[in-house]
């Protein structure tokens, strides 16, 4: 040992590494000694170190190794002696260190365990490097772990004062001394424990006292080493050597030892691998991973001095890897917990340890680990960073070679165990030094101190910080990521190490001898690169895939029609044709356009061209989607919308081929057969034109006016959606037709305008039809959305497209939905059934209904066109509103005609804006209802009912009759009768709605696009991106949020169940209210009916003209309801109520004659839509009427609770719907100024409207139409509508009002409950939704059945799961629209209603029962019931979209309102009924239906109340 020490001194004198304070003197010597000692160690260690290491190996990994190592070391002391002697003989501290590292690891650990004994502890302290012990343990962590951590561990764990002093001194020295000093000391101490400790004292501790202590300890430990500690001494030497010598001895003999080490590595790869866990070689083998793993290796320094020194080398070479020090710490903990990983970890640790040693000089500086680990830092700090690191590398390499060789020799006999032990010792010392020091008394403390030194010792932390600063300085902080990466990489690396490590170790050996860590880095880098190659695919891929589907324009195609079972497809002409049909390309659509142009009239041809043009994604339709590639939904909207326009433009198209053709033939035949057939035969041959022509010539005129009026509003919306296109088209169309501003706006508008003109001309003659055709042609040319105009021509291409390619505009989910054939089959069957049902009424009606149905279906299929058609729908809405204004002149027939036109127009327009156009159509129908009780109600209700029930003509008329009965005339039934005629339109519309449900299911975004365009496309575009995925969601959102489909971000959730979709407010409003929705049809019908029915009930009050004004006007209309004429105008505005999205439309509608009573209030409210919403909340007390209106709404909300009558259930629906409205209102405040205006028009605008409603309620109650007035305020929100309806009921049922108020409160609470409600809906799944739908569908259907025409409205399919699903999907959009409309008013109502509930209760109770109790209440009941019915439908629609909420939160405004409404509705429902929301909905629907029946019973207020009582009981 003295010789070794002398040699170490000589080596220090030689100072291979002069830069290293101690190592420069001792490095060469130490390395030589280490080499020789390593050789000797190999010779001796194989004998004894095997048992020692064997005993220790299990203990090291466990951290218990040191104590057993003690005894084994004590048993193997001779071998440590021999090892030490061999180092002495070899006079190489490197050899001694290596030997000590191998056999001395156990002994060193035992010595460290012995440091519990004063002798061993003094020795270890004396050798703070404990070079033999330290090297043994510290080859893995020679410098930083062994010295600093070992000393520190001794200090902490070992009560021995010497250790504590030396640990403190070491810490001080580490702070003072460079790692090189420690390395020299470690080398010297390892080589000669005495001199090594002197070096430790001098260099590590930085003062000779430590050397004296080291001498004393050497002397004391020398006997220990000779006696019991020789092995331990050798271990200390090995550790110290490993620390200092691996760092500096290796640095001293970097070339020599490294070359030898390389040779040795090549000779014994596996052993070297094992040794590598402890040796520099392990650093080479595991440097990269270990560096990564132990770059943060404050603890790693504890793992092994040799590893630490090696790591120092690599860390100084790989400063960038030091950030893994923290990972090393983490791995230390892992190793401590998982000793089995030690073998792998020591390697990583040795790599990381050395890297960390060099990087984290700090750890070696504070603890030995800080010195070795921070050696690079210190070296960098002391200008020895690289040189020392190189030296360290070389010395460590040498030392590791020596150690690796001897341990390899030792590993050969005991290398596996010893090297494993040594690895584990390193790992343990690095990671399990706590355990090692704990078992060893010093080692446990050592690792603890290592951790403490890392964490607690400011020097360690500082050095760690230094390491972080120096490059691997982020030792602790980055371990989280690094840990995963390292561990994973370590594993990979281990795998590579076993297979590639020999080669790479050789390369690394060769490279480290080069001494540049950069070489090591290069070598490490390959592994890192290798690891990099193992990167997992980014999660973004799914989004890419989804976006890809989203962007697919041809996603309109029903992919479901493709047989997925066909693994291989023979692309025969038939197949290609099939696929071309399924997925029409540009050429296909161009061909289609050409075919349409050639097969259809000139007007048809332009429309078809446009439609084909756009669906072909060739020009407008496809190119805009291409332009909007980012917003692929928007593209789809455009494409589908155009297709929808095409479809809607052609009833045949809507019918998909046969249906469309049949409908078109029927239409043409029926239209021609009709006096207006000539006109319809003209360009007006479009579905809407034929139907309209069939229906009414007065209606044509009214519709022309309505179209005119609607055109500007629609223009506004179209400008919003497609400003350039819509404006150009509008301008061109406008220039072409003064009477058809809507037509100018968009194909739907064109269609509507042209149809209106055609109808207007139909009565006058065919000249107007030709003019319409010409203008329509012009429109087709000018308007991108032209296809809507040519319904007849459109059917061909649409029929081909629909038949060949049931276009699912919804995108991928839409395709999936279509694949389920829900939307496609349902649409087709619904359209067909509905056409058949509607055909019951009359051939013309049937044709009309059938054609519109087909148009609707095709429109729905063409959701992309719907986006474009949204403009048309908006314009059409405006037209409808205009017609509503003009409508009063032509009350019934004009209304029917208009209704038919509207239905036709909607058929076309609905294709243009599935939701919006449907809503517009519905609204137009509502307008028609308002305008013409039969037609409008038939159209709106029929549309809704067709939507809901796939309805038969009888089903549509009942609602139409109901609506018409409610508001068209004092006699409610009479308008209901006209429902069947309108039902054809409605049937068509329903077909469209069904198709909308289906297509909405397949192309929710399309419907959303329609709705957005119609209402607040721009505002809710953001919420619309997922619409295509979530049909129900889309339907609710389609009016408000179709444009957001452009946002493909949310669409990336194909599942549509990600909270991503809910992050928008739509999350809250969307799901709970939507899930139970009866069906898209019911919801849509409900929206339209609620708008139209409420408005219609309120009887086309001018308030219906504009959403806000509709309410006011509806109030007037209630008064005017007896005056069917004024009521119809208001109904036109009611249609505009749906047009609430179009503030301009609303404003325009307000301009209608119906504005007479509420025009100013509506204007005010529209103007103050957002303010009015707040004012709505506050205005309930503003005026009795407002309070009453609020009360009505609140009553409707509360009625479920307060009322024990049937009214209570509808109020429950109202309350249910109110949350949606409220949420929607909330969102409307932000998103829909006009919506809010509308809501305000209904609610806030009801200071006038409500006062008017109070009056109108009173008057209408007197006149039998007050319900409409009450409904109109209710219409502010869905709940508002219901509130009015329920207000009507409270008129005859005060408890209803109270219950509504309670439900309103429940509504507000339900918002908060809706997440669970959504979850319950989700949990219940479609079962709940279906249950709700069935409850809503059947009750809606039954009451309609009760009314006889209600049956017509609710076809048997309405209860069918498919139809229910469609209702959920398709009903949501109108619900959303209505909810959006009512959302503003609904939120206002919810707030205002709460205030006005008492007032409303008193007023409604007073006014309604006081006024024509039977007739007024009857109408009110009907209105309320119908509203409730629609509200329930809406509620169900809202509930239905629970999955919509799941699907998407694009409809944040609508969705949130809807969800809130759903939640609130459920809350109210539960509050008023403590029953399952489903049952409540069912009963509420039943009560609504019973109320409707009672209403259908005209003035039978008692009956209605009885019904109410019955259903309240049910509730």
Curated annotation (Swiss-Prot):
GO terms for cellular component: cytosol; midbody; nucleoplasm. Residues 381-415, 505-529, 731-774, 1158-1225, 1372-1422, 1435-1479 are annotated as: Disordered. The keyword Cytoplasm applies. GO terms for biological process: negative regulation of cell adhesion mediated by integrin; negative regulation of cell-cell adhesion mediated by cadherin; negative regulation of cell-matrix adhesion; negative regulation of neuron migration; nervous system development. Residues 1180-1193 have a biased composition (Low complexity). Its main location: nucleus. It comes from the Eukaryota. Residues 381-405, 1455-1479 have a biased composition (Basic and acidic residues). Residues 1442-1452 have a biased composition (Basic residues). Signal peptide: none annotated. InterPro entries: DUF4683, Nexmif. Expressed in the brain, particularly during the late embryonic and perinatal stages of development. In the developing brain, it is expressed only in the cortical plate and subplate region but not in the intermediate or ventricular zone. Keywords: Cytoplasm, Developmental protein, Neurogenesis, Nucleus, Transcription, Transcription regulation. Residues 746-757, 763-772 have a biased composition (Polar residues). It is found in: Nucleus; Cytoplasm. Involved in neurite outgrowth by regulating cell-cell adhesion via the N-cadherin signaling pathway. May act by regulating expression of protein-coding genes, such as N-cadherins and integrin beta-1 (ITGB1). This is Neurite extension and migration factor. It comes from Mus musculus. The gene is Nexmif.
């Amino acid at each position: 040992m003295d010789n070794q020490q002398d040699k170490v001194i000589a080596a220090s004198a030689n100072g291979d590494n002069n830069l290293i304070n101690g190592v420069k003197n001792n490095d060469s010597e130490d390395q030589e000694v280490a080499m020789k000692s390593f050789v000797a160690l190999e010779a001796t260690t194989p004998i004894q170190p095997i048992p020692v290491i064997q005993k220790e190996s299990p203990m090291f990994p466990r951290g218990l190794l040191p104590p057993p190592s003690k005894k084994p070391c004590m048993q193997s002391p001779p071998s440590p002696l021999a090892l030490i002697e061999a180092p002495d003989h070899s006079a190489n501290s490197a050899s001694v260190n290596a030997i000590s590292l191998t056999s001395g690891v156990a002994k060193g650990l035992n010595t460290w365990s012995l440091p519990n004994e004063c002798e061993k502890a003094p020795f270890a302290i004396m050798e703070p490097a404990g070079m033999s012990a330290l090297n043994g343990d510290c080859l893995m962590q020679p410098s930083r772990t062994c010295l600093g951590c070992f000393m520190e561990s001794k200090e902490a764990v070992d009560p021995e004062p010497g250790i504590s002093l030396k640990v403190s001194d070491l810490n001080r020295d580490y702070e003072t001394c460079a790692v090189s000093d420690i390395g020299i000391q470690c080398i010297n101490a390892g080589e000669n424990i005495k001199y090594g400790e002197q070096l430790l004292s001098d260099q590590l501790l930085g003062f000779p006292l430590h050397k004296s202590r080291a001498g004393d300890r050497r002397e004391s430990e020398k006997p220990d080493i000779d006696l019991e500690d020789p092995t331990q001494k050798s271990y200390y030497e090995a550790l110290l050597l490993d620390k200092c010598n691996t760092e500096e001895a290796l640095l001293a003999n970097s070339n020599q030892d490294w070359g030898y080490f390389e040779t040795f590595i090549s000779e014994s790869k596996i052993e070297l691998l094992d040794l590598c866990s402890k040796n520099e070689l392990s650093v080479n083998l595991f440097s990269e991973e270990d560096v990564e793993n132990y770059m943060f290796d404050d603890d790693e320094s504890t793992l092994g001095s040799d590893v630490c020194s090696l790591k120092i080398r690599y860390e100084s070479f790989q400063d960038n890897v030091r950030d893994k020090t923290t990972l090393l710490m983490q791995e230390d903990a892992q190793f401590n917990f998982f000793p089995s990983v030690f073998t792998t970890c020591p390697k990583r640790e040795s790599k990381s340890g050395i890297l960390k040693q060099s990087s984290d000089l700090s750890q070696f500086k504070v603890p030995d680990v800080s010195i070795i680990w921070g050696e690079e830092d210190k070296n960098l700090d002391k200008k020895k960073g690289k040189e020392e690191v190189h030296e360290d590398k070389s010395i460590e390499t040498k030392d590791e070679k020596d150690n690796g060789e001897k341990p390899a020799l030792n590993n050969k006999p005991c290398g596996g165990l010893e090297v494993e032990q040594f690895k584990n010792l390193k790992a343990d010392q690095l990671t399990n030094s706590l355990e090692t020091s704990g078992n060893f008394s010093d080692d446990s403390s050592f690792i603890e101190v290592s951790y403490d030194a890392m964490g607690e010792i400011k020097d360690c932390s500082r050095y760690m910080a230094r390491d972080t600063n120096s490059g691997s300085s982020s030792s602790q902080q980055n371990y989280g990521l690094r840990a995963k990466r390292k561990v994973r990489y370590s594993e990979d690396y281990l795998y590579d190490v076993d297979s590639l490590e020999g080669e790479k170790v050789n390369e690394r050996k060769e490279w480290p001898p080069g001494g540049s860590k950069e070489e090591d880095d290069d070598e490490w880098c390959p592994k890192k690169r290798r690891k990099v190659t193992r990167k997992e695919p980014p999660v973004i891929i799914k989004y890419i895939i989804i976006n890809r589907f989203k962007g697919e324009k041809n996603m309109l195609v029903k992919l479901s029609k493709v047989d997925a079972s066909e693994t291989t497809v023979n692309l025969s002409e038939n197949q290609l044709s099939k696929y071309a049909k399924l997925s029409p390309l540009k050429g296909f659509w161009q061909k289609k356009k050409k075919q349409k142009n050639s097969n259809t009239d000139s007007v048809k041809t332009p429309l078809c061209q446009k439609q084909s043009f756009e669906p072909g994604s060739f020009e407008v339709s496809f190119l805009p989607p291409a332009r909007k590639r980012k917003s692929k939904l928007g593209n789809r909207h455009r494409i589908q919308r155009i297709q929808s326009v095409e479809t809607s433009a052609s009833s045949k198209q809507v019918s998909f081929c046969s249906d469309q053709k049949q409908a078109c033939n029927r239409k043409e035949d029926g239209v021609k057969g009709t006096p207006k057939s000539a006109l319809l035969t003209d360009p007006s041959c479009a579905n809407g034109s034929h139907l309209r022509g069939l229906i009414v010539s007065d209606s044509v005129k009214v519709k022309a006016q309505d179209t005119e009026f609607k055109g500007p509003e629609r223009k506004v919306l179209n400008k919003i959606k497609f400003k350039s296109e819509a404006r150009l088209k509008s301008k061109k169309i406008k220039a072409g037709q003064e009477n058809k501003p809507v037509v100018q706006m968009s194909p739907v508008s064109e269609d509507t305008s042209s149809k209106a003109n055609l109808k207007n001309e139909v009565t006058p003659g065919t000249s107007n039809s030709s003019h319409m055709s010409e203008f329509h042609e012009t429109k087709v040319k000018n308007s991108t959305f032209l296809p809507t105009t040519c319904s007849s021509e459109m059917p061909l291409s649409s029929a081909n497209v629909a038949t060949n390619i049931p276009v699912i505009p919804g995108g991928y989910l839409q395709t999936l939905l279509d694949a389920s054939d829900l939307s496609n089959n349902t649409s087709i069957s619904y359209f067909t059934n509905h056409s058949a049902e509607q055909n019951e009424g009359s051939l013309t009606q049937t044709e009309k209904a059938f054609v519109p149905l087909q148009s609707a279906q095709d429109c729905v299929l063409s959701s992309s066109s719907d986006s474009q058609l949204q403009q048309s729908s908006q314009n059409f809405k405006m037209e409808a509103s205009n017609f509503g204004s003009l409508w009063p002149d032509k009350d019934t027939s004009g209304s029917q005609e208009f209704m038919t036109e509207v239905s036709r127009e909607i058929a076309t327009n609905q294709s243009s804006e599935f939701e919006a156009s449907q809503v517009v159509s519905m609204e137009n129908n509502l307008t028609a209802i308002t305008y013409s009780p039969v037609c409008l109600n038939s159209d709106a209700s029929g549309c809704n009912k067709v939507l809901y029930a796939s309805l038969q003509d009888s089903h549509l008329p009942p609602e139409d009759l109901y609506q018409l009965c409610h508001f068209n005339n004092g006699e409610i039934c009479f308008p209901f009768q006209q429902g069947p005629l309108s039902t054809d339109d409605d049937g068509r519309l329903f077909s469209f709605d069904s198709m909308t449900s289906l297509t909405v299911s397949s192309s929710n975004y399309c419907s959303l696009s329609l709705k957005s365009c119609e209402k607040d496309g721009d505002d809710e575009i953001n919420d619309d991106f997922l619409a295509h995925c979530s049909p129900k969601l889309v339907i609710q959102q389609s009016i408000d949020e179709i444009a957001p489909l452009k946002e493909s971000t949310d669409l990336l959730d194909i599942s549509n169940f990600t909270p991503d979709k809910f992050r928008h407010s739509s999350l809250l409003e969307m799901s709970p209210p939507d899930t139970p929705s009866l069906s898209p049809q019911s919801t849509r019908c409900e929206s339209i009916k609620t708008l139209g029915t409420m408005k219609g009930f309120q009887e086309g009050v001018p308030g219906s003209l504009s959403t806000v004004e509709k309410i006011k006007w509806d109030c007037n209309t209630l008064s005017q309801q007896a005056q069917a004429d004024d009521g119809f105008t208001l109904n036109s505005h009611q249609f505009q109520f749906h047009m609430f999205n179009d503030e301009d439309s609303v404003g325009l509608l307000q301009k209608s004659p119906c504005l007479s009573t509420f025009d100013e209030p509506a204007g005010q409210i529209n103007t103050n839509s957002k303010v009015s919403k707040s004012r709505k909340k506050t205005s309930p007390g503003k005026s009795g009427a407002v309070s009453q209106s609020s009360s009505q709404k609140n009553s409707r909300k509360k009625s479920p609770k307060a009322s024990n009558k049937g009214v209570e259930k509808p109020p429950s629906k109202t309350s249910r719907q109110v949350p949606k409205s409220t949420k929607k209102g909330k969102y409307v405040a932000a998103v829909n100024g006009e919506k809010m205006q509308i809501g305000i028009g209904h609610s806030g605008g009801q200071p006038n409207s409500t006062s008017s409603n109070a009056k109108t309620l009173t008057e209408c109650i007197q006149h039998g139409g007050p319900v409409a007035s009450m409904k109109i305020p209710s219409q502010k929100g869905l709940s508002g509508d219901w509130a009015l309806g329920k207000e009507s009921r409270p008129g005859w049922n005060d408890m209803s009002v109270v219950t509504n108020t309670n439900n309103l409160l429940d509504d507000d609470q339900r918002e908060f409950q809706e997440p669970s409600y959504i979850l319950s809906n989700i949990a219940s799944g479609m079962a709940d939704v279906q249950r709700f739908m069935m409850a809503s569908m059947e009750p809606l259907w039954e009451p309609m059945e009760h009314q006889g025409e209600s049956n017509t409205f609710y076809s048997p399919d309405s209860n069918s799961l498919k139809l229910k699903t469609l209702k959920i999907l398709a009903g949501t959009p109108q619900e959303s629209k209505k909810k959006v409309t009512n959302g503003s008013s609904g939120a206002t109502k919810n707030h205002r209603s709460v205030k006005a509930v008492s007032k409303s209760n008193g007023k409604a109770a007073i006014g309604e029962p006081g006024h024509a109790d039977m007739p007024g209440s009857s109408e009110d009941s009907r209105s309320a019931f119908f509203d409730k019915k629609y509200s329930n439908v809406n509620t169900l629609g809202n509930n239905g979209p629970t999955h919509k909420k799941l699907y998407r939160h694009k409809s944040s405004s609508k969705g949130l309102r809807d969800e809130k409404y759903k939640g609130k509705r459920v809350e109210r429902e539960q509050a008023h009924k403590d029953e399952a929301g489903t049952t409540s909905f069912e009963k509420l629907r039943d009560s609504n239906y019973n109320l409707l029946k009672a209403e259908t019973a005209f003035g039978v207020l008692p009956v209605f109340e009885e019904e109410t009582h019955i259903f309240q009981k049910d509730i």
